């Protein structure tokens, strides 16, 4: 995919409409654009999924054999393999160039050996994966970095996903702080209507939503004018009013952006085969692809600079009918010694990488407004699991794939970094990866994310990934 020149695109009427929200932002703040996308796969990503041929050779093919986990052979100090053909890994072939698609191998970094046993591992670590803390004990990295990245976007973060739960909103993966879970929209039809409702349905729908906020705001203002209760109750009303005013302001901003975002919208739920034909229970991968469509529009349209896509992490017994019918993720993992199950597990991880690669290529083909390069240059995409390296994880290892963000200082140039295994002096932790993202977000003092306490091995970012 060839990136259009900024001059050619922006001179066209379509280009002006398409990038109006980003042009507005660039004019408002002359700072380098920065974005973050985090993708989680539920219930484990096995290290072999990300092990390139070069990394296998470096560690000793005979030492690994057919093992799917092999941290025992990791080096005593971090080993960086540059110019690595990461697409040779079992589940990373979607990064290779094919059928007119650009290669993303030279835009990627694979990290093996990072640990985070403070989270507890298990089937799922809940908010632990993104907080480097005990489940429910701290804010997750998306919530911490979103305010730093938001700038003029109407949404600080968009959180989407899939789940085996029957509810359309779940709360187990992201958190604003201790015991303050953040909602994730796990039904793509609801996500579409919630995010794009007033944009997709036109000015009338937007006016109706604004009128509802105006009515509620006037009602609270009238109550406050005559309120004689205690100060705590008054504070609650004042916070409610502030929330309504924020929502009303966002609705007005969305209305101003509608014309430029409408051409980017994915198919409406009733017309989208990924939603309409997903079955019951829905094929999690079809719904996830629909959520990726929504996320892509949000990024291209300037609706947010922070996205979380949580695949089954808040209810992990999801189904993948397009890959292996009738069996849920939990039973699939328990039967991993069955060749068909292992093949399916690898195919599921590979599908996640394919969806990530599609997003990355779209961003790579889109010129950044207000800075040089493409949107991918200014967007860090991180793919990892919600519990570590296997079905019943201890948090001993969290394989990770990082794409893009080279303009933010990330060394995503086609490298694999292998860290010593947990328990070794030079092991590094997932919190170091998140510290790296904090530095990439522009905060040079972001060095102690996570609640490891005395078990923290080292502060700061990963020097092999950032600098």
Enumerate the language-model features and the residues they cover.
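Ligand-binding pockets and gating/stacking loops
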Residues: 2-467
């Amino acid at each position: 995919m060839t990136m259009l020149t900024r001059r050619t695109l922006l001179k066209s009427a379509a280009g002006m409409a398409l990038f109006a929200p980003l042009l507005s932002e660039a004019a408002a703040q002359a700072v380098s654009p920065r974005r973050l996308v985090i993708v989680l796969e539920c219930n484990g990503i096995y290290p072999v999924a990300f092990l390139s041929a070069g990394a296998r050779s470096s560690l000793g093919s005979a030492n690994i054999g057919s093992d799917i986990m092999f941290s025992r052979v990791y080096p005593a100090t971090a080993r960086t393999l540059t110019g690595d053909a990461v697409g040779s890994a079992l589940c990373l072939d979607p990064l290779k160039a094919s059928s007119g698609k650009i290669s993303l191998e030279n835009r990627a970094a694979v990290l093996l050996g990072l640990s985070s046993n403070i989270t507890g591992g298990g089937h799922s670590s809940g908010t632990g994966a993104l907080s480097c803390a005990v489940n429910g004990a701290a804010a997750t990295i998306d919530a911490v970095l979103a305010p730093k990245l938001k700038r003029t976007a109407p949404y600080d973060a968009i959180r989407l996903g899939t789940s085996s739960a029957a509810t359309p909103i779940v709360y187990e993966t992201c958190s604003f702080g201790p015991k303050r879970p953040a909602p994730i929209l796990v039904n793509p039809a609801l996500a579409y209507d919630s995010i794009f409702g007033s944009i997709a349905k036109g000015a009338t729908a937007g006016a109706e939503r604004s009128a509802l906020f105006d009515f509620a705001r006037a009602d609270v203002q009238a109550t406050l004018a005559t309120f004689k209760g205690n100060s705590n109750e008054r504070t609650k009303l004042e916070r409610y009013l502030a929330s309504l005013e924020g929502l009303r302001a966002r609705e007005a901003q969305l209305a101003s952006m509608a014309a430029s975002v409408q051409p980017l919208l994915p198919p409406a739920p009733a017309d989208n085969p990924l939603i309409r034909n997903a079955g019951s229970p829905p094929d999690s991968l079809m719904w996830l692809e629909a959520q990726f469509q929504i996320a892509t529009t949000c990024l291209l349209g300037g609706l947010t600079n922070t996205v979380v896509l949580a695949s089954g992490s808040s209810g992990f017994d999801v189904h993948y009918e397009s890959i292996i019918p009738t069996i849920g993720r939990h039973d699939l993992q328990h039967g991993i010694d069955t060749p068909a199950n292992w093949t399916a597990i690898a195919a599921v991880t590979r599908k996640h990488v394919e969806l990530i690669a599609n997003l990355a290529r779209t961003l790579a083909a889109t010129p950044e407004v207000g800075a040089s390069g493409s949107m991918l240059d200014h967007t860090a995409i991180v793919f990892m699991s919600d519990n570590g390296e296997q079905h019943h994880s201890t948090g001993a290892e969290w394989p990770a794939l990082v794409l893009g963000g080279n303009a933010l200082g990330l060394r995503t140039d086609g490298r694999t970094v292998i860290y010593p295994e947990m328990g070794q002096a030079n092991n590094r932790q997932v919190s170091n990866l998140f510290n790296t993202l904090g530095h990439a977000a522009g905060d040079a003092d972001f060095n102690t994310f996570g609640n490891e306490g005395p078990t923290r091995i080292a502060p700061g970012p990963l020097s092999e990934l950032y600098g």
